[in-house]
């Protein structure tokens, strides 16, 4: 439940337009709301508001077909609006036709059931590949989800171990990528060929000359499927353990990629919050041996 007072500059606005422009709701998000104006239920989003009107919104209960399951959830950060999870590798985020349960989503539904007593929809703001570890944002309601998508800022940083010695300390990869046919693998494609704009900022953290490996930080400026994996492979530095883009390597059982830091706009205060987590054990053990 949220309450607002209409600001003078929005006098005469339609209630739907007001909520979209000032609160970050999408058209889809508005359909999930019960809206009250000065205590009376609003049945049409074209209803005009007046300055100092009181607005109360309630989110309609939404069911999910994802059943709760006892899947371990490592909470990196939580408040009344968001849950940030430190995802382990080797777990799928959301059910698919081939994998209908034992996913992270099943664990999140179970976590919410235990902590709130309700079956809540797991609203993932971002997802990670099965073999990628690290931070995933889960919005607790459609308002927060819409806010992050439409109004808020979210910055995502990864650490990765790549093959080869990356020469430049810092650089920007600006190469459009896309898939060809039904291939999982992303390739460099021009926009005309169906490629999507993709930008990744790279910074070298440490070079391991004897092992011919480099630990890098990658900041996503866009969010494309396999973006870091594809971009580093295109640059000639595939991720260690990434069989799809770099071939098999006995030193790693999975791609050495970890979402270690996320910055996001707090929906209540507008201030930026930073959440940072440590590397997973397999990446730490690999680096400590060097």
Give the residues covered by each predicted segment.
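Residues that recognize and position ribonucleotide moieties
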Residues: 126, 170-171, 195, 226, ...
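A short beta-turn/loop motif at secondary-structure boundaries
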Residues: 126-130, 194, 208-210
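Pseudouridine synthases involved in rRNA/tRNA modification
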Residues: 1-28, 206, 210-211, 221, ...
């Amino acid at each position: 439940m949220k309450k607002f007072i209409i600001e003078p500059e929005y006098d005469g606005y339609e209630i739907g337009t007001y909520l979209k422009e000032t609160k970050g709701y999408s058209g889809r998000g508005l359909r999930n709301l019960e809206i009250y104006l000065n205590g009376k239920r609003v049945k049409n989003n074209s209803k005009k508001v007046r300055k100092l009107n009181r607005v109360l919104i309630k989110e309609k209960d939404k069911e999910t077909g994802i059943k709760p399951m006892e899947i371990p959830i490592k909470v990196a950060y939580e408040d009344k609006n968001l849950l940030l999870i430190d995802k382990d590798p080797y777990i799928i985020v959301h059910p698919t036709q081939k994998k209908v349960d034992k996913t992270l989503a099943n664990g999140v539904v179970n976590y919410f059931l235990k902590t709130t007593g309700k079956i809540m929809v797991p609203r993932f703001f971002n997802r990670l590949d099965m073999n990628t570890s690290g931070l995933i944002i889960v919005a607790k309601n459609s308002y927060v989800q819409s806010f992050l998508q439409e109004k808020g800022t979210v910055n995502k940083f990864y650490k990765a171990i790549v093959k080869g010695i990356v020469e430049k300390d810092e650089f920007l990869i600006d190469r459009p990528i896309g898939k060809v046919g039904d291939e999982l693998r992303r390739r460099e494609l021009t926009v005309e060929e169906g490629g999507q704009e993709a930008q990744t900022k790279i910074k070298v953290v440490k070079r391991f000359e004897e092992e011919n490996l480099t630990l890098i930080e990658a900041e996503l400026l866009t969010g494309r499927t396999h973006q870091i994996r594809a971009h580093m492979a295109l640059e000639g530095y595939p991720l260690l353990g990434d069989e799809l883009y770099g071939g098999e390597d006995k030193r790693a059982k999975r791609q050495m990629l970890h979402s270690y830091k996320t910055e996001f706009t707090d929906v209540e205060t507008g201030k930026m919050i930073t959440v940072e987590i440590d590397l997973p054990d397999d990446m730490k053990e690999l680096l400590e041996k060097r």
